[in-house]
Amino acid sequence: DLLHKNNIQINVDDARHYNAMTGLMNMIEPDVIIHLAAVSHANKANKDPHTTFDHSLRTLENTLDIARSFNSHLIYFSSSMVYGHFKESNVTEETICNPLGMYGSLKYAAELIVKAYNQVFDLPYTIIRPSALYGERCVSRRVGQIFIENAVQGKDITVQGDGNDKLDFTYIEDLIQGINLVIENKNSLNQTFNLTFGE
């Protein structure tokens, strides 16, 4: 409803279907493509690697080929999960990636493929690494949502591990503002950004 109210055209198709995506993009001729198609949760990725590969890398392959044909600025949504466990108290874009599990590993592999398209085809890109999104319309059952639901329902809040792990939460409106800045600023081309709250 929100998209319709703002006159944003919605086309529903499977991003794994190359011909359907090509036909759609030929109608739009995009200057910018924001690639969001993927399995969106680490637990799901670890439970079903086959589907994760298909939904993450097949969709990216199609998107890259289409972006290349229009020389579109590709904005690829990666994840802070590419860092794995890190020793530093703060993570920067220069922190060495050492992903754990299927989700982080596939996100990092996809980043390398995006960069390869830039090297071989001069495709402009920006990689965004958000962390722990929360906010309106979030239905992915991430840790923040689970904690709030349990608190409201009077249930226990369980913290995994020894309690020393840190997670930088990102409010959805802040992420949207960051995306807009990436689109509007040519200095964002061929760069990687951690889009998080920063604490």
Identify what each model region corresponds to.
Residues 1-32:
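N-terminal Rossmann/SDR dinucleotide-binding element
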Residues 42-59, 91-99:
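Short alpha-helical oligomerization interface
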Residues 51-53, 95, 100-111, 141-145, ...:
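Short-chain dehydrogenase/reductase
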Residues 38, 48, 53-60, 64-67, ...:
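Short alpha-helix in the Rossmann-fold core of NAD(P)-dependent oxidoreductases
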Residues 83-84, 98-102, 126-143:
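Flexible, glycine-rich beta-alpha linker
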Residues 108, 133-146, 155, 160, ...:
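Glycine/proline-rich active-site loop of Rossmann-fold NAD(P)-dependent oxidoreductases
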Residues 29, 35, 61-102:
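Conserved Rossmann-fold NAD(P)-dependent oxidoreductase catalytic core, especially the SDR/UDP-sugar
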Residues 85-86, 98-126, 151-153:
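Active-site Tyr-X1-5-Lys
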